[in-house]
Amino acid sequence: MAKRNAVVVTHTRLRQTGTVVAEAVSQLRVAGFEVAIIDNTEAPDFGVQPPCVSDDTEIVVVLGGDGTILRAAELVHCTQVPILGVNMGHVGFLAEFESFQIDEAIRRVSTHDYSIDERMIAHVDVWLPGATKPIEDWALNDITLERADRGKMVELSIRVDDVEMNSFGADGVIVSTPTGSTAYAFSAGGPVMWPNVKALQLIPLAAHALFARPLIIGSGSTFTIDILDDSMSEGWICCDGRRQRALPQGTRVMVRESRDTLRLARLSGVPFTNRLVSKFDLPVVGWREHARNEASSQSLHHGHTFPAAAYAAGVAVAGDAGVAGTEPDKPGERDGKAGS
């Protein structure tokens, strides 16, 4: 029988304090896997590829949150090894299972009962002033270019396919993949992009400009971001919140779709839309629905009966100050919560 290899990626605190890691390793070994455990993956330097898992690794099981999955992504970059995430954190957007489902997850892995979801990766070339070749890196979630001096703005020029689109002073910009559109870019006001969309988006951060808005480009296009020579601050680039370095004035950053992808193991057919609603606990019933519910029994006003449809359409009722319905929710009264 051929040897089966698996890698379990977690973090030191979880390994030291919890039994889930020991349980997962035990079950993988019972299923016939030789298991290696990685629990302390320091962020490598920007532009440096850390050692990857061996090509004969069948799967990488990640026990942790989305941050642990981003660390695991460095270990499988440029390989065909898939990642299976078991959420031990808060949102766990990339995870396939929750911690209480570990038995089912290992059983499905051992029988190859999973599909592969290939996620787009962003490639970045950093051209330092006077350089003859770029420093290369990549990101599953996002690439941020921010001000190095927290008291000053960084002056940037934004190009798409070598056509200048805008220039402004700002705290920085985020370039996000579809996977990263529910992370930092989402918090900065960017749109959610479905994973099957082949695109990159650029989100300005507190830009001092009237028309600095998010930009979305197709997979064949390139974002070019120049730190202007007269910028008051140097820049600071960071990939997936891990690999980072300072960038002087005159640096050019170019971001495009990578030829590589990340392979996520999927054990369920839950669509992304369902995952989005459940993970973010979206308040899909808004204040207008409360008006419909109140009107469903029909309201009698001044001797006239008004059907529920009139209320749902926002018809003004004689004698009322405004349209029928309730006021919007006050802060703290909404169902659900904001994203992570």
From Swiss-Prot:
Organism the protein comes from: Bifidobacterium longum (strain DJO10A)
Chief localization: cytoplasm
Name under which the protein is recorded: NAD kinase
Described purpose of this protein according to its UniProt entry: Involved in the regulation of the intracellular balance of NAD and NADP, and is a key enzyme in the biosynthesis of NADP. Catalyzes specifically the phosphorylation on 2'-hydroxyl of the adenosine moiety of NAD to yield NADP.
Keyword set includes Disulfide bond: no
Record-linked PANTHER family: NAD KINASE
Molecular functions per Gene Ontology: ATP binding; metal ion binding; NAD binding; NAD+ kinase activity
NAD keyword on record: yes
Active site (catalytic residues): 66
Biological processes per GO annotation: NAD metabolic process; NADP biosynthetic process
Membership in a protein family: Belongs to the NAD kinase family.
EC number: 2.7.1.23
HAMAP family per UniProt: NAD_kinase (MF_00361)
Swiss-Prot/TrEMBL catalytic activity: NAD(+) + ATP = ADP + NADP(+) + H(+)
Lineage: Bacteria, Bacillati, Actinomycetota, Actinomycetes, Bifidobacteriales
Broad class of enzyme this protein falls into: transferase
